[in-house]
Amino acid sequence: MHPHDQTIFALSSGRLPSAIAIVRLSGPHAGAALQMLAGKMPAPRLVTRALLRDPQGEPIDDAVVLWFPAPASATGENVVELHIHGSRAVIATLFGVLSETPELRPAEPGEFTRRAFENGKLDLTEAEGLDDLIHADTDRQRRQALRQLKGLLGDKVRRWREQIIEAAALIEAGIDFSDEGDVPAELLAPALSRVQQLLLEIEAVLAAQGRAERLRDGLTVVIAGPPNAGKSTLMNQLARREVAIVSPQAGTTRDLIEVQLDLDGYPVTVIDTAGIRETDDPVEQEGVRRARDRAAHADLVLWLSEHDGAEVERQGETPLWLVRTKTDLDGAERATRPDTKASRTFGISARSGAGMGALLDALVGFARNFFGSTESGLITRERQRQSLRQTADALQRSLDTVDLGEELVAEELRIAALALGRLLGRVDVEDLLDVIFREFCIGK
């Protein structure tokens, strides 16, 4: 049996218990399942109240039901939504009835979205945008995901693909109808001009790809420094909750502690690390090793010090700010050594809050510069970048092979069009689909 001959069902709303739960069904037998549960079919796309019953006539729950006949539905199939009370007992009873119904089965993760993709309701870039929207933690991530979900990248790729196919058709028509075998200049010149313009557009998108991808992944800030310098206190201040143990005893933090922050809409992961020092304790040694490793791979290191920063360790080329802590404990302004290798210096008291505003403002400014103008970023995933890179390379080869024969030019354009088709998920991507849609939750 083909998977689409089966009707799937899943809880599409949040964790139970809840005030309302939404159960979604999709497939050829969704309507029959609704008829069985509600006793009658509601009008399409009209909110209808119904008492759901099991096959023995026992009430399950009072519900609001919606019926979306194919193809005018989210998945392109017959779709039913059951809005019921978010009780674990109600859901268990309903799922028991559905599971015992022939040709109905529980949905796999992402299966509703995959069916929508396979039925042409959205392309692969829009499906990835939906996944990004589900996992968005900040407003800027939400806006970026919505742009992709609405087809900003997909529409542009479709237009590029159509223009490449048109250019290839012009060249192939010239080959087919030319007595000498050479494409007439009046056909070749406009085709190559169009290819050159497309190449410039695609290269511009590739040049800006890092911004959107960085916004999706977020900025990593590591808090490092010697033991008892106030790292965990700063971590708690930034998180605005107790996420790290604060103790006057040195070496309290042995492992990495991560917290996700939203700084002016920018996603930031802050990592508290073990105090860096020489030690004979093997557990603490491992903590120090991990601290140095994360600092080397961070986007920014905040090096905390009670003193003048003489003990600063800089890992690689990672930007480093010196943050002098506990300024409320010394009455005089402390000088900073000129050879600390820190690009910026701040003085704070995490306990009193002095200096925290300036540090936060600086972090927001760093994030703004790090992410750049994300409005122009379209590529959020490595898969998308690779497909566009393959397209641009094929277009460049088509321009470079003009003197070797128009057949080679047309072949390179065909390769470019295929790469864009893979980006949209329309050709040669079957192996990717399971990987992509497994990232979705069940019920989506």
Curated annotation (Swiss-Prot):
GO terms of biological process kind: tRNA methylation; tRNA wobble uridine modification
Binding site for GTP: 228-233, 247-253, 272-275, 349-351
Any one GO cellular component localisation term in the record: cytoplasm
Record-listed E.C. numbers: 3.6.-.-
Cofactor(s) needed: K(+)
Entry binding sites for Mg(2+): S232, T253
GO molecular function list: GTP binding; GTPase activity; metal ion binding
Pfam family, one: TrmE_N
InterPro entries, A to Z: G_TrmE (IPR031168), GTP-bd (IPR006073), GTP-bd_TrmE_N (IPR018948), GTPase_MnmE (IPR004520), MnmE_dom2 (IPR027368), MnmE_helical (IPR025867), P-loop_NTPase (IPR027417), Small_GTP-bd (IPR005225)
Limits of the TrmE-type G domain: 218-368
This protein's record includes keyword Transferase: no
Binding residues annotated for (6S)-5-formyl-5,6,7,8-tetrahydrofolate, in chain numbering: R24, E81, K121, K444
Domain of life: Bacteria
Listed CDD domains: trmE, TrmE_N
Cofactor binding comment, as recorded: Binds 1 potassium ion per subunit.
Subcellular location as annotated: Cytoplasm
Keywords: Cytoplasm, GTP-binding, Hydrolase, Magnesium, Metal-binding, Nucleotide-binding, Potassium, tRNA processing
Function (record text): Exhibits a very high intrinsic GTPase hydrolysis rate. Involved in the addition of a carboxymethylaminomethyl (cmnm) group at the wobble position (U34) of certain tRNAs, forming tRNA-cmnm(5)s(2)U34.
Complexes and interactors: Homodimer. Heterotetramer of two MnmE and two MnmG subunits.
Family affiliation: Belongs to the TRAFAC class TrmE-Era-EngA-EngB-Septin-like GTPase superfamily. TrmE GTPase family.
Name this polypeptide is given: tRNA modification GTPase MnmE
Originating organism: Bradyrhizobium sp. (strain ORS 278)
